């Protein structure tokens, strides 16, 4: 999973944003109304004297069982989960990964390996150091590295984790900025009107299928917002100068 902006997607992905601590590190609070990962807990801190650990909200997406032939699920992946965290950093950071159930981690490996300056296990927890913003997956206890999980795999569900250490996002709107229409969770926003920016407030949103995008507009999803639905534009000549950004999640 990568934070790539895409229209009409059926994948869950983190879009690109803000909120919390040290000068070079921005960690987001939990998404109101969204359960944290059942499998992992994550903390992060800047690599600097006196830096303190901050809890990073771990979001989980799960594979369902096959319900019909067109939903894109596979029964062999039922119960698999992926956990991910988003934060912003301008410098080096250290990430701590622990199992949510308190059981110890025995081994860990970051991929791509070249992106992590170190990856180790201490006292049953994994520690990853990143010297600059990057995206890495961390294989816990060799679940993906030491076995073939391709076609024919019939073992227990696997639970993977990724770290999205994004560069600082500039130009974030504020809910009270001129031209900004803020959207509360549970409210379907208007697809048009006297606004230039839709700002999804912290929480869980559902915009339904094919929410219309408009030219010369931007759509902002902060790191503590989850937006379910898809975005589309079917109006000829209206699909230009559209920006979707923030480090929240758009799940189609």
Task: List the model feature ranges, each with a label.
Residues 6-18:
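Bacterial N-terminal signal peptides
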Residues 167-217:
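N-terminal domain-start segments of secreted/luminal proteins
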């Amino acid at each position: 999973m990568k934070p790539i902006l895409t229209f009409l997607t059926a994948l869950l992905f983190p879009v690109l944003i803000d909120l919390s601590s040290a000068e070079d590190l921005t960690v987001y609070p939990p998404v109101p109304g969204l359960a944290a990962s059942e499998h992992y807990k994550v903390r992060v801190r800047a690599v600097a004297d006196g830096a303190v650990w901050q809890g990073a909200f771990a979001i989980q997406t799960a594979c369902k069982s096959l319900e019909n032939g067109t939903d894109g699920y596979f029964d062999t992946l039922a119960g698999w989960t992926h956990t991910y965290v988003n934060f912003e950093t301008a410098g080096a950071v250290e990430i701590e990964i622990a199992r949510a159930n308190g059981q110890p981690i025995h081994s860990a490996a970051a991929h791509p390996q070249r992106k992590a300056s170190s990856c180790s296990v201490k006292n049953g927890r994994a520690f990853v150091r990143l010297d600059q913003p990057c995206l890495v997956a961390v294989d816990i206890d060799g679940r993906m590295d030491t076995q073939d999980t391709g076609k024919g795999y019939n073992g227990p569900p696997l639970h993977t984790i990724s770290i999205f250490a994004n560069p600082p996002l500039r130009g974030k709107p504020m809910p009270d900025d001129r031209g900004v229409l803020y959207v509360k969770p549970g409210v379907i926003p208007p697809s048009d009107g006297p606004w230039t920016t839709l700002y999804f407030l912290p929480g869980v949103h559902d915009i339904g299928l094919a929410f219309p995008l408009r030219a010369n507009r931007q759509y902002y999803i902060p790191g503590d917002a989850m937006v379910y639905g898809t975005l589309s534009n079917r109006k000829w000549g209206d699909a230009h100068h559209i920006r979707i950004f923030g480090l929240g999640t758009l799940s189609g």
